[in-house]
């Protein structure tokens, strides 16, 4: 069992939209032998669309909308370990932040992709905050070095300031843009030379940094600048130590170009070597160690309609400890029921295959026909455990959802229920007029919901404006005060889909006045309290 745990690497690739995250995922799959041709995501110039963007709407827009799970085996050159790599490719589009935050609860480490011309962007900052909260180790890949970009030292300073983490370069670019010659691999002390449009790294040369061979290969000026830069790197940044990376104090940095496969294999080789294998998972009752003999796992994502011919849901379960086995009975803790799974699956984006067993770190797809699962559910061999940390954040945009076809109200209801269980958005039912309000993190989610209701559930909806500032979950130890608050604010009170009380404030002023007037009421901005 320990051998199985040791060889697993479960991680997310995260970034701001268009920094090259899906492209990097595809290249990892290419090196892992999972796909023969990587589909460039950009506007589908290539007809083969990216493997990891598989919902119709994603293919149309060239952006990733929901987390894909992919896995492959990989043995680096010269290594005798076959690593089992589980990648979660997350949506970079800011409207899908909820899905991404949740994914970060199911991984042991993360790779952050940064565009070399743009540096750190808003989405990257938000996601890094979640990594910091959870002490998730990160590696940073600075992409698009074959385009004109910013000075590497400036980028490193910005990473340290904006992401609030110390960095340590493990590779260094030799020039950039049209003059880009390659990278010097500090971690392996090799020179990787760049030739555009090739499917593999062309020349890997073991060149001593002070030898004349270096001048011949990259030109005297470039060689002199490289020596100067590396001296500065060693002077400024502490020597790399794996333990400081694993404890999330230091982020190693690599440079390259994902589109041209450049610097990708170096990143992958170093990653599987240094990244942590599955780590302990915090439950409310105790910390669960991966090597415990009994199976435990939690649901971090639910996807409806992977197969449009069957209205079915798949619940994604992260195995936390023990060995998961097909057809074994497991306890669904929230419902107190025993369940067996006859066809658990593993994924390569849309292709899935049935498995007999899975180990800590693996992601297993469990068919969910009757809406059995909710996000955050725990499965065990009988122990009462509740895994923590799958919050919903307070949405920023709100609209009333109305039925546009009275003959299809049942389909609409089913569609809304399934999409909400999937965590696409949040549903609030106003207690005053009983109207349904959908709250999202971004505008695009409204389009996605409308599109999916029509295409997957054959139901039409329309949106109507509602002016709201924030939704906050409220609770109080003083029942009388809580009742008084609900009476006074009754037209602003709603229930979320779990039946919890939510106060819908229509302005920042109203919210701060409510907090002042009702001292014994706690206002929460995430559902995890």
Language-model features: where?
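Structural and coupling elements of P-loop NTPases
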Residues: 1-529
């Amino acid at each position: 069992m320990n051998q199985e745990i040791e060889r697993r690497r479960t991680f997310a690739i995260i970034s701001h939209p268009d920094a090259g995250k899906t492209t990097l995922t595809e290249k990892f799959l290419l090196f892992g032998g999972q796909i023969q041709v990587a589909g460039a995501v950009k506007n589908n110039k290539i007809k083969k669309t990216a493997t990891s963007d598989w919902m119709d709407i994603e293919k149309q827009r060239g952006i990733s909308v929901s987390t894909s799970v992919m896995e492959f085996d990989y043995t680096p050159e010269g290594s005798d370990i076959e690593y089992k790599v589980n990648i979660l490719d997350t949506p970079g589009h800011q409207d899908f932040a909820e899905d991404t935050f949740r994914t970060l609860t199911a991984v042991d480490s993360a790779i952050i992709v940064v565009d070399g011309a743009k540096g750190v962007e808003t989405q990257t900052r938000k996601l890094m905050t979640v990594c910091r909260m959870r002490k998730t180790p990160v590696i940073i890949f600075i992409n698009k070095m074959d385009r004109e970009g910013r000075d590497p030292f400036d980028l490193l300073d910005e990473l340290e300031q904006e992401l609030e983490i110390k960095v340590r370069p493990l590779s260094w670019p030799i020039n950039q843009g049209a003059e880009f010659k390659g990278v010097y691999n500090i971690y392996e002390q090799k020179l990787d030379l760049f030739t555009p449009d090739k499917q593999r790294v062309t020349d890997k040369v073991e060149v001593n940094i002070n030898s004349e061979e270096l001048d011949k290969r990259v030109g005297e000026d470039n060689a002199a600048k490289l020596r100067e830069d590396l001296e500065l790197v060693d002077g400024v940044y502490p020597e790399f130590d794996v333990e400081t990376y694993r404890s999330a104090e230091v982020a190693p940095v690599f440079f390259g170009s994902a589109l041209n496969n450049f610097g990708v294999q170096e990143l992958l080789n170093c990653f599987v070597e240094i990244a942590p294998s599955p780590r302990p998972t915090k439950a409310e009752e105790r910390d669960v160690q991966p090597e415990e003999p009994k199976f435990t796992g939690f649901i971090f994502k639910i996807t409806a309609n992977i197969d449009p011919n069957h209205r079915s849901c798949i619940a994604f379960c992260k195995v936390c400890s023990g060995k998961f086995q097909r057809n074994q009975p497991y306890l669904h803790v929230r419902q107190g029921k025993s369940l067996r799974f006859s066809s658990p699956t593993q994924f390569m984006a849309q292709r899935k295959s049935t498995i007999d067993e899975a180990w800590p770190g693996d992601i297993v797809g469990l068919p969910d026909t009757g809406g059995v699962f909710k996000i955050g559910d725990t499965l065990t061999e009988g122990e009462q455990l509740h895994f923590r940390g799958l919050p919903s954040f307070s949405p920023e945009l709100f609209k009333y959802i109305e039925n546009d076809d009275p003959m299809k109200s049942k389909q609409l209801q089913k569609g809304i229920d399934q999409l909400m269980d999937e965590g696409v958005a949040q549903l609030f039912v106003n207690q005053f007029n009983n109207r349904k309000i959908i709250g999202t993190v971004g505008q695009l989610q409204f389009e996605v919901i409308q599109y999916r209701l029509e295409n997957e559930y054959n139901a039409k909806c329309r949106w109507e404006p509602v002016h709201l500032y924030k939704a906050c979950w409220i609770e109080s130890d003083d029942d009388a005060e809580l009742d008084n608050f609900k009476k006074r604010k009754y037209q602003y009170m709603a229930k979320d889909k779990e039946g919890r009380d939510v106060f819908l404030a229509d302005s920042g002023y109203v919210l701060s006045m409510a907090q002042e007037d009702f001292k014994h009421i706690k206002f929460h901005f995430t559902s995890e309290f």
